[in-house]
């Protein structure tokens, strides 16, 4: 959903011909760039998250708390990316889907955005408990599974509640073309504060605190798996910062310095960083599922079952993967059955 749409026709009407020409160039660029990025994220996110869901449901039983979260995360991302074709069409043309669809898609878009970010936070906390409090976590696996299901349900409820402003105040406005959004400064401020708190600062602070302790714990541990785990942690942190920080920084600047709306370059920056931020829906399956040896084994089972690839030495690959993971599984029995092993 283009963040600049709500105000794209404000702050330019009184400018000279040069500024108007720059703004028209920006509008033409936005009609090409953002819809194309939306469609790329949609296709990649649809394929990746669908694969994770299919494998999680049909090839792997929910045997750990991490598995519970790894079902909810791709579900949220999948529904999220399914709203993008509508915004892509609206970016090229205008909003033609009516007021009910406007409110519905704003709600779906926002609910699944919050759900995805909150689940990422829970996955981080779960990793902390598994690595730092391994014995306690192992002895309370059944209780943790129950707690995980309750937490997942609570996350969806919280996401619905904090999305109510968009659902209630979302409407179709005619600003030279029909636009779906919420054109109210007070609502925009509330939405921005909520998005930055739940969608950026909470996951970021949780990652910093939990991963700092996890890294310290792993550095005192032995074995080859330590180095792989540290690489995964740094990769997760780097991807989160690179995709989410630029867009959130731009939104923060926009909320405190409204004069930037008069700068076409600022609109370009908002648009590009927004597209980068949405890449998380494509990268989450790679970061949180495909890094798992067990998940990759189940993926090849799926490929074999649907006949996409001939069965050529796959069993040897599975065996090799399982043998390579025995050392880690023996020392970290808590999540030995989980698809994701940190």
From Swiss-Prot:
Subcellular location per the Swiss-Prot or TrEMBL entry: Cell membrane
Tissue/organ expression: Expressed in lymphoid tissues and activated T cells.
Glycosylation sites noted in the Swiss-Prot or TrEMBL record: 16
Extracellular side: 1-32, 90-103, 165-187, 260-275
InterPro entries: CCR1-9-like, Chemokine_CXCR6, Chemokine_rcpt, GPCR_Rhodpsn, GPCR_Rhodpsn_7TM
GO terms for cellular component: external side of plasma membrane; plasma membrane
GO terms under biological process: calcium-mediated signaling; cell chemotaxis; G protein-coupled receptor signaling pathway; immune response; inflammatory response; positive regulation of cytosolic calcium ion concentration; viral genome replication
Segment forming the signal sequence: none
Cytoplasmic-facing ranges: 60-68, 126-143, 216-231, 294-342
Membrane topology of the entry: Multi-pass membrane protein
Keywords: Cell membrane, Disulfide bond, G-protein coupled receptor, Glycoprotein, Membrane, Receptor, Transducer, Transmembrane, Transmembrane helix
Transmembrane segments: 33-59, 69-89, 104-125, 144-164, 188-215, 232-259, 276-293
Domain of life: Eukaryota
Disulfide partners: 102-180
One GO MF term attached to the UniProt entry: G protein-coupled receptor activity
PROSITE patterns (UniProt xref): G_PROTEIN_RECEP_F1_1, G_PROTEIN_RECEP_F1_2
Family affiliation: Belongs to the G-protein coupled receptor 1 family.
Function: Receptor for the C-X-C chemokine CXCL16. Used as a coreceptor by SIVs and by strains of HIV-2 and m-tropic HIV-1.
Protein name per the record: C-X-C chemokine receptor type 6
Organism: Homo sapiens
